[in-house]
């Protein structure tokens, strides 16, 4: 099956650098990403950087290995996640706005073999899920 693409955009009432620093740090993920239980970094104090890798544990038991593949503060950030026959990418773009910034999330999910159908289903839901997660992150940052 071909990759399933998704997209979402959310306005944040903070500067692009603030949104970038929060969203681009895997240690913050369990606070705003609804499907995530925990993040395991090889070194908990490691600052986010290009090539940083970690493992996530999701509510459904999936434990993908994640890696930051783009780190251009404060304008662009990307990651790739792999778990068994599934691969997912996420790219975040940070656009300055008069009242803060807009975060644009684009990505795709693909699966091989027995994982093709579950990946396609996950891809259909990903745009809605990332939109909801980004709105939660915007609320968290807006209240600080």
Tell me the role of every PLM-derived stretch.
Residues 17-20, 131, 135:
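Amphipathic alpha-helical segments that line or abut small-molecule/effector binding pockets
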Residues 80-132:
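Beta-strand/loop substructures that line and gate deep hydrophobic ligand-binding cavities in soluble
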Residues 1-46:
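Hydrophobic ligand-binding cavity/cleft-lining segments
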Residues 30, 40-89, 97-98, 102, ...:
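Glycine-rich portal/gate segments that line the openings of hydrophobic small-molecule binding cavities
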